[in-house]
């Protein structure tokens, strides 16, 4: 008897398509929108890289490594053939104090900076039961300086029985283009934190606020939902010297057999 493949993302995508309320949005494209949803993935069993369409994993890892560099310029991304941030960059490639800057160099009132990622890792090692182990990109005082305000703005780390779980809050969730990318990114980050802290992986829990499908993605969504899901792959993570020393070659996806890519326009 065939094993039932769980499809939390596809189930939510179908819900938004069938139950979403028509809404306007910042980009002028228009959406179907549903407010408040949660997806759960057991990272010990598999890696949540969607199979109902091919997800650009090189781009997922490139962006994540770029965040962990604390970078605000697209130059490093472009050098590594990742162009997903080009639309928002200015003529010099700058984006302002976006995700990576807040993660690695959150400014304090006295002129110092906090490396939230290092603090989070230290907390995992020294106080794993802490309920205060969060990383935020939502710096209210700097939002207006950012080319794009954070969509996935907060994550919390949780340890039980030697397993690390992560919960992510995403205020604005582009269900077709953005969320598949974000799921894989935070799943990879959970593996990295766990490996560096000497823990096993637990769950990735994704919580979405405004979960939406853009009007010009509806046909693509219908095509994706018509496809039969396949087994999720596994992630083999080669250990780096530190959380900040991982490179593209350290991430090996095993058994990834997705349906073909489905093209769609990004709403800027």
UniProtKB/Swiss-Prot annotation:
Tell me which Pfam families the record gives. Thymidylat_synt
Active site: which residues?
151
**Which pathway?**
Pyrimidine metabolism; dTTP biosynthesis
Q: What class of enzyme is it?
A: transferase
Q: What is the superkingdom listed in this entry's lineage?
A: Bacteria
The GO annotation for biological process reads: dTMP biosynthetic process; dTTP biosynthetic process; methylation
Which CDD domains did the record assign? TS_Pyrimidine_HMase
Which protein is depicted?
Thymidylate synthase
Originating organism: Corynebacterium aurimucosum (strain ATCC 700975 / DSM 44827 / CIP 107346 / CN-1) (Corynebacterium nigricans)
| Native organism taxonomy | Bacteria, Bacillati, Actinomycetota, Actinomycetes, Mycobacteriales
UniProt lists the gene as thyA
């Amino acid at each position: 008897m065939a094993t039932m493949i769980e499809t939390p993302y596809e189930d939510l995508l179908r819900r938004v398509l069938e139950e979403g309320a028509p809404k306007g949005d910042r980009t002028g494209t228009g959406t179907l929108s549903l407010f408040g949803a949660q997806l759960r993935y057991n990272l010990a069993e598999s890696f949540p890289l969607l199979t109902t369409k091919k997800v650009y994993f090189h781009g997922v890892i490139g962006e994540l490594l770029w965040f962990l560099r604390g970078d605000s310029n697209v130059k490093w991304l472009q050098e590594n053939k990742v162009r997903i941030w080009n639309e928002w960059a200015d003529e010099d490639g700058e984006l302002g104090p976006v995700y990576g800057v807040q993660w690695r160099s959150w400014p304090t009132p006295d002129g110092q900076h906090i490396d939230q990622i290092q603090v989070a890792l230290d907390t995992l090692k020294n106080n794993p039961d802490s309920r205060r182990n969060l990383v935020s990109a939502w710096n209210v005082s700097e939002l207006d300086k950012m080319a794009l305000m954070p969509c996935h703005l907060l994550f919390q780390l949780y340890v039980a029985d030697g397993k690390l779980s992560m919960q992510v809050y995403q205020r604005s969730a582009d269900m077709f283009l953005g969320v598949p990318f974000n799921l894989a990114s935070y799943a990879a980050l959970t593996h990295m934190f766990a490996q560096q802290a000497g823990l096993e992986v637990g769950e990735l829990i994704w919580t979405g606020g405004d979960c939406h499908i853009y009007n010009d993605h509806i046909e693509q969504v219908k095509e994706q939902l018509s496809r039969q899901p396949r087994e999720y792959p596994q992630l083999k993570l080669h250990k780096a010297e530190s959380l900040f020393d991982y490179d593209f070659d350290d991430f090996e996806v095993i058994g990834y057999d997705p349906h073909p890519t489905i093209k769609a326009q990004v709403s800027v």
